UniProtKB/Swiss-Prot annotation:
Record-level GO BP terms: dGTP catabolic process
Organism: Nocardia farcinica (strain IFM 10152)
SMART domains per UniProt: HDc
PANTHER family in the record: DEOXYGUANOSINETRIPHOSPHATE TRIPHOSPHOHYDROLASE, DEOXYNUCLEOSIDE TRIPHOSPHATE TRIPHOSPHOHYDROLASE
Keywords (A to Z) from UniProt: Hydrolase
Protein name: Deoxyguanosinetriphosphate triphosphohydrolase-like protein
GO molecular function: dGTPase activity
Boundaries of every HD domain copy: 71-192
Protein family membership: Belongs to the dGTPase family. Type 2 subfamily.
């Protein structure tokens, strides 16, 4: 157990040796110092698509306060948490790290709110799903490698890397469902999934997904506390516990209301949580809040390692050799923390009003770009527009354009189109 194969390390396009070095193409740096998965991680790390996440909303907007988390900082945190779990289970840490960096790389401006707006615009033409856009960016849209026929292979990552980065390794099955590939990218998905069990995610992908949940639940609550939107004492209040549990059950129907109430109570009784009840922005309370986030991340990551080892044993685990174990009480704790952010930040009337304006802006830009295309399209997307032979293909180009925008650029284009 624990070995990656040549099949895992295969790339869609065979690449030649680098030629610009001062030594021979077979120098130690090229041939020995970097694994294929380390190269994959570097490609994601240096991509323009990753940098653009700095101006895309996580929960609080990129311009809300001095230190809000963005999609970029969130992705970096997911990568770090995932790397820690990978170290504990024997997966290649670079593989899980890059999956964390790439897991939101296809998200449009305004986060999940922008995703809803683009999905509504593109619904008759295959819809929009951030996870499917991840695959499209990694295998087509991010410029790095061309196939011999001149078509783009995107970053040309290894099979195992792409498989680790796809949360939902299947196509669209119906409205409102999560999926990892548009019909137009079915060939890419088939190549990635060659030899993989149907609808089963690799262990590296499961680690990335759990790390995403952990980062979301802990760090987004931290941002809400700092912004004055979340009071952690709600976790100890019976009335708020009941309200949170009811909302959490709607979001996570596999978890019962009583389980979620117990999770809130259990968290409220942890000394690190109680110490952060009275956050007021002072240095001491900031230390308490940071200790809370650190200890909760460790609690949730360690629980997954321990539960997985209890079933799979002590040997290094890779790919499809094991499933990640999540203890039910820990799953409930993460779910209740995610619900705290949902109830006190995302359900706020002012926040919802701003979200409505964001969706209208995306709809207006999408309609305007389609009506004036190809005038406002980026040069990189012009070949796709020229080759588009159907409304579905043309709408996909418009969606690719908007999904690539930062929030600042979207707002500039909206003003430009409005005249």
């Amino acid at each position: 157990m624990g070995d990656y194969t040549e099949h895992d390390r295969e790339r869609m396009v065979v690449e030649g040796a680098k030629t610009a070095g001062l030594g021979s193409p077979d120098t130690e740096f090229t041939a020995g110092h970097r694994t294929q998965f380390a190269r994959d991680r570097a490609r994601v790390l240096h991509s323009a698509a990753l940098r653009r996440l700095a101006d895309k909303t996580q929960v609080m907007g990129p311009r809300d306060g001095d230190t809000p988390r963005t999609r970029l900082t969130h992705s970096i945190e997911v990568a770090q948490i995932g790397r820690s779990i990978a170290d504990g289970l024997g997966c290649d840490p670079d593989l899980v790290d890059l999956a964390g960096l790439a897991h939101d790389i296809g998200h449009p401006p305004y986060g999940h709110n922008g995703e809803k707006a683009l999905d509504a615009f593109a619904d008759p033409y295959g819809g929009f799903e951030g996870n499917a856009q991840n695959l499209r960016i990694l295998t087509r849209l991010e410029p790095k490698v061309l196939a011999p026929d001149g078509t783009s292979a995107g970053l040309n990552l290894t099979r195992a890397a792409l498989d680790a980065a796809i949360k939902y390794p299947w196509g669209r099955t119906g409205p409102g469902t999560k999926f990892g590939a548009y019909d137009i990218d079915a060939d890419r998905l088939a190549w990635i999934r060659k030899g993989a069990p149907d609808r089963v995610r690799s262990l590296e992908c499961q680690i990335m997904d759990w790390s995403d949940d952990v980062a979301y639940s802990v760090h987004d609550v931290e941002d809400g506390v700092i912004a004055g939107r979340i009071d952690l004492r709600a976790l100890a209040d019976p009335q708020e516990q009941a309200a949170l549990a009811a909302m959490g059950h709607r979001q996570h129907p596999e978890l019962g209301v009583d389980e979620l109430i117990a999770a809130a109570q259990r968290l409220s009784e942890l000394p690190v949580v109680a110490d952060a009840f009275r956050y007021d922005g002072t240095f001491a309370s900031s230390v308490a809040l940071k200790r809370l986030t650190s200890e909760l991340v460790g609690r949730f990551a360690t629980a997954a390692i321990t539960a997985t080892r209890a079933v799979a044993g002590p040997a290094p685990l890779v790919r499809y050799q094991a499933s990640l174990g999540i203890p039910p009480i820990v799953a409930a704790e993460v779910a209740i923390l995610k619900t705290v952010a949902l109830r006190y930040v995302m359900s706020d009337p002012v926040h919802k009003q701003r979200q409505a304006a964001q969706r209208e802006r995306i709809q207006a830009v999408a309609t305007g770009l389609l009506a004036t295309a190809p005038r406002h399209l980026d040069p990189q997307l012009l070949p796709w527009w020229v080759e588009a032979d159907s409304d579905t293909a043309r709408v996909r180009v418009i969606v690719d354009q908007i999904a690539s925008y930062t929030e600042s650029r979207l707002e500039r284009v909206a003003a430009q189109l409005a005249g």
